[in-house]
Design a protein with these regions (language model features):
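Active-site helical microenvironments for divalent-metal-assisted chemistry
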Residues: 1-202
Length: 202
């Protein structure tokens, strides 16, 4: 499969939107995550629209809805719709987001929708969750359970954070497997590894 210059334009929007952002709790440029997710979508046979949306899947959530006009103008309505479908909650006018659990329940509801757009978006969502969980597992192995402290802000206890994180990934894995998303086969061993870690939390 060959790609048009739309992919270059998507990458440039991602660069400008996320250029000064880093991965949570680290100095790793946020762009690394976006390119990793796009690569996973390519490897699973994703379309050009899906790869472009993978590069942009966090733009509205992390850089603001003001980018939607440029995404639409440069890449089309369908790519924007995919980005919206992959978005995990938008901040309000003051920049505040809903609670972690509220956002995750809503995200799961979106993943359960059985529409052509939702099925396309699942390919991107699965790639996103796979890369996020792989990164979390690396952090857990390098830094121990304390790596969970930067997640699930509305759960005060470490074990509760771990169990909430495991619930989220297990629920999504079940959806991806039922819908036949190919990346689920890679996500399953990562979820199994997380389950072992959570089981041993104090």
């Amino acid at each position: 499969m060959s790609f048009s210059d739309r992919l270059t334009r998507a990458a440039d929007i991602a660069r400008r939107a996320h250029n000064h952002q880093t991965r949570k709790g680290s100095d790793v440029p946020y762009l690394s995550h976006l390119f990793a997710v796009a690569a996973l979508v390519m490897e699973s046979g994703g379309s050009e629209d899906q790869v472009c949306a993978a590069l942009l899947h966090d733009v509205l959530e992390d850089a603001g809805v003001g980018w939607s006009g440029e995404i639409r103008a440069e890449l089309g309505e369908h790519v924007l719709a995919l980005v919206v479908a992959c978005t995990d909650g938008l901040p309000d006018a003051e920049g505040h987001k809903e609670s972690w659990r509220t956002r995750k329940h809503r995200y799961i509801e979106h993943c359960l929708q059985d529409t052509p757009l939702a099925r396309e978006a699942l390919v991107i969502c699965a790639a996103d969750k796979l890369h996020n969980l792989r990164s979390l597992l690396i952090d857990l192995r390098e830094h121990g359970p304390a790596a969970l402290l930067k997640f699930v802000k509305d759960e005060p206890e470490l074990r509760d954070k771990g169990e909430a994180t495991l619930w989220y990934y297990e629920t999504l894995l079940s959806i991806f497997e039922r819908r036949g998303v190919s990346t689920a086969r890679l996500l399953r061993p990562a979820v199994d590894a997380l389950r072992e870690i959570v089981r041993d939390l104090p």
